[in-house]
Amino acid sequence: LGKLLDVYESRLLDVYESRVLDIYESRLGKVLDIYESR
């Protein structure tokens, strides 16, 4: 059971991290677009 939990936790972390990175990158991209259009 412990190993299964470890695998599940690491999967969850991977998904969470990639989602946070996606959101962060899209926000950063929008900010850069606004900054460059000036």
UniProtKB/Swiss-Prot annotation:
Keywords: Transferase
Record's keyword annotation contains Transferase: yes
MF GO annotations: glutathione transferase activity
Protein name as annotated: Glutathione S-transferase 2
Main function: Conjugation of reduced glutathione to a wide number of exogenous and endogenous hydrophobic electrophiles. In plants, may have a detoxification role against certain herbicides.
Coiled-coil annotated spans: none
Protein family membership: Belongs to the GST superfamily. Phi family.
Superkingdom of origin organism: Eukaryota
Entry EC no(s): 2.5.1.18
Organism lineage: Eukaryota, Viridiplantae, Streptophyta, Embryophyta, Tracheophyta
Top EC group: transferase
Catalytic activities: RX + glutathione = an S-substituted glutathione + a halide anion + H(+)
Tagged with keyword Transferase: yes
